[in-house]
């Protein structure tokens, strides 16, 4: 092993420029791969962090002219009671806005503004809240709220938050009843204040469609026929006004698996962040192509160095070195260079997290949040070094010493064929990425700069919530 490391250091000193280009190319490729895969991982795992995620569904109202993510409260209440397979059902009103309140700690009063969402108490059961302290049934009580752990620490430091009060200017207050573990960014559950919904709020209003409706089933297979069973046994006499009727509305319920909501784009009033499965596949392919291009570039550089290294290799053969040992040393040399590039790539990712690049990615790009991806990329770096080094290693050691006297391997037919093939694949992949990026830029430029016939700076646009329209 000492001999292998000594040879590696000798190669690094002798071929500084080639080594530098290899390390820079691979490190940039690995860092780009990690950043792209962070975004892919973020979208693929969206809303998959709950217990029995496959049993959670969002109920959406679908009409002949389109769908919407909101529903009226009495219809949701009737649906929850319609089947024994519904373990828990909840409504959430995301249109409530922010709360302005103060928290007094150690004689100092600090003012905060935080989002508050009114929900059914069963909200914590549907999404299986992990409580750090407090009573899981706290939302059953009026004027009691739940805080995420990060918010509780911001308000009260390391002291217990349960029993503390959020005070308002008019003298009213809310009491903290529980602290739950923060949810990751790629979650429909927001890390905000949760308060029990007023039991009388739109309880009999069939025309007030303001609420997001979630249910948890005892078994995801029981989703089949859930709406048909509800509609067959629904009593129209429950409808107390003329703002809603089954007849003529063409309405049905779509019971959408929660992980699919992230990719659902055909409903209105949906505040869940969106992504496209096709885009994820494209990003994944781009990440792989970037690493492949860097690996081919590494192989090509190693092959190009053959004429300058073959004398040293043949000298080792003359001195009794076995071909298998020499090949192993050459492959290990490539693997070590790839690992060094990988470590430098991690440093580039860390630096990117401190720059504006972080704003281009929805995911948290801190390496500690993606241990699995970091380890997977480490394995890919080893595989890249092995695959990029195995061909040059075998070619460098497969020719007799007489070849050194006759000419250069780099100019031999085999050498030219290998290098031409590698360069061809590399150019095709590179040009493909360049052309794709160019078309995306031109399309984006066209959408942003094409004259529309009016002055965009003088036009105001607003999208009212269902609450504003009711």
Predicted ranges, named:
Residues 5-17, 21, 25, 294-337, ...:
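Intracellular coupling helices
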Residues 119-132, 145-275:
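Mid-to-C-terminal secondary-structure elements
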Residues 33-162, 168-175, 228, 358, ...:
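Structured, solvent-exposed hinge/loop segments at the ends of secondary-structure elements
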Residues 39, 44-53, 191-200, 263-271, ...:
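Short juxtamembrane loops and helix-capping segments at transmembrane helix boundaries
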Residues 2-5, 10, 14-15, 49-50, ...:
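Membrane-helix entry/capping segments
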Residues 22-25, 29-32, 284-300, 333-345, ...:
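Alpha-helical transmembrane segments of integral membrane proteins
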Residues 31, 254, 334-401, 442:
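Small-residue-rich transmembrane alpha-helices
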Residues 14-42, 419-443:
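Short, strongly hydrophobic transmembrane alpha-helices
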